[in-house]
Amino acid sequence: MARCRRHSRSRSRSRNQCQRRRRRHYNRRRTYRRSRRHSRRRRVRRRGCSCRRCSRRRRRRC
């Protein structure tokens, strides 16, 4: 009987770990996607001008 009880306990623990792992992975993916967007925006700003004329010609200087 003791063995049975121990087995059920370990089973539930492993299930919880799996859920935690999955949740952590999802959060990591989400943050990575968000950071990528921000970095792209910053690059555009660093280049220089962002007015309509320059954006149409694909030139970042005014």
UniProtKB/Swiss-Prot annotation:
Summary of the tissues where the protein is detected: Testis.
Gene, per the UniProt record: PRM1
Region (Disordered): 1-46
Family affiliation: Belongs to the protamine P1 family.
Protein name: Sperm protamine P1
Coarse class of the protein's main subcellular location: nucleus
GO cellular component, one term: nucleus
GO molecular function terms attached to this record: DNA binding
Presence of keyword Cytoplasm: no
UniProt keyword Transcription regulation, yes or no: no
Function: Protamines substitute for histones in the chromatin of sperm during the haploid phase of spermatogenesis. They compact sperm DNA into a highly condensed, stable and inactive complex.
Highest taxon of the lineage: Eukaryota
Keywords: Chromosome, Developmental protein, Differentiation, DNA condensation, DNA-binding, Nucleosome core, Nucleus, Spermatogenesis
